[in-house]
Amino acid sequence: MNPYQVVKDFEQAVARYTGAPYCVAVNSCTAALMLAVAWHLQKRMPDGIRYKATWVFDTETRHTAGIIGQHAPLHEVNIPKRTYLSVPMSIIHAGGRPTFRDEEWLGMYQLEPLPVWDSARWFTTDLYGIAGMRQPSGPKGAMVCTSHHWSKTLGIQQGGCILHDDPEADAWLRRARFDGRTEGVAPKDDHITQVGWHCYMSPEVAAEGLVRLHFLPKHNAPLPNDEYPDLSQLEILR
């Protein structure tokens, strides 16, 4: 028996529940956002340019600076200034530069101008369709990132998902979450073509998610926002 089949079963169940064509499970919504942003940013780079951004804090100027190769620009990704701390950090780790806006949001918000949505505080049926209707460019290409942390609606140990509609992105995301590896192929037999991260969902977490999803109501209200600080005032993120 393949122990990772339960992860695929969980992904299929979440896709049905939310109305998403594809679902990629990872170990947190933070990781989901990072991978979704990374996918879109690398698609926006000129052919042949692949860069890594290194962020350093200059104690003299009191500013954070990005050091990148090949003079590649840092793409700005705009988010509400009051959200969870890991969101701008995910943007940085993905190679972008976070900027902030004033927005009173509930349930989900867009990481502008990317078609990426942070829905850590809302998990309900037809979630993917809801995000698509809110997206100014139309529903195509939306990536909705969910959280299944024990404090959230589904309430398993940890975990998150990327809901999307792109078969090319699906293959990339599955390798990206698993150290660049191909699912089901031993490292010695694999042909590694991309640098990945180590953020896949473990089978035991997926199994718990399947059980809880079976009993989850169809319609769930957004969770209230925490008392988030103003992230635009953090020097490390400026």
Annotate each predicted stretch with a short phrase.
Residues A25, I79-P80, I162:
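Conserved SAM-binding loop
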Residues A31, L85-S86, E168:
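Short alpha-helical
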Residues F123-G129, K140-R238:
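Active-site region of PLP-dependent enzymes
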Residues A38, Q42-D126:
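PLP-dependent aminotransferase-like
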Residues A32-H40, G160, G209:
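Buried hydrophobic packing segments
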Residues M1-A31, W39, L223-R238:
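Conserved N-terminal alpha-helix of the aminotransferase class I/II PLP-enzyme fold
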Residues P136-G138:
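Long, low-complexity intrinsically disordered regions
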